[in-house]
Curated annotation (Swiss-Prot):
Protein's membrane topology: Single-pass membrane protein
First-listed, main subcellular location of the protein, grouped into a coarse class: membrane
Compartments it resides in: Membrane
Other information: Partially overlaps YAP1802.
Lineage of the species this protein comes from: Eukaryota, Fungi, Dikarya, Ascomycota, Saccharomycotina
Record's keyword annotation contains Transmembrane helix: yes
GO cellular component, one term: membrane
Name of this chain's protein: Putative uncharacterized protein YGR242W
Domain of life the protein comes from: Eukaryota
Originating species: Saccharomyces cerevisiae (strain ATCC 204508 / S288c)
Length: 102
């Protein structure tokens, strides 16, 4: 039910960034996201350190994870957006898309 973003998952990620200078993959995201099937939700961790940042767009990174193989009848696409809102806080948005073939 609760799943942490692992280093192995990050190393296999496709990285798209709003900031061309920030295409590197960080060693660890360090936030936990909750897995609800096909749900869209927002997790702010930790809430107490959330600080508004005017330069938030340049600090946004988008990670796309593909789970499944060409032979499988179902696959899942995780789209994780990581925003650094302060030195200790990160805003994580997760969109899970499921594909089924009949």
């Amino acid at each position: 039910m609760v799943q942490a973003v692992s280093d192995n998952l990050i190393s296999n990620a496709w990285v798209i960034s709003c900031n061309p200078l920030a295409l590197e993959v960080p060693e660890r995201i360090g936030s936990t996201y909750f897995c609800f099937g096909g749900a869209i939700f927002i997790l702010v961790a930790p809430l107490t350190n959330l600080v508004y940042n005017e330069d938030i767009v340049s600090q946004t990174r988008l990670y796309i994870y593909y789970r499944g193989s060409r032979d499988s009848r179902a696959c899942m696409l995780d789209i994780v957006t990581l925003v650094d809102v302060s030195k200790r806080s990160k805003l994580v948005l997760l969109l899970q898309i499921y594909f089924f073939s009949f």
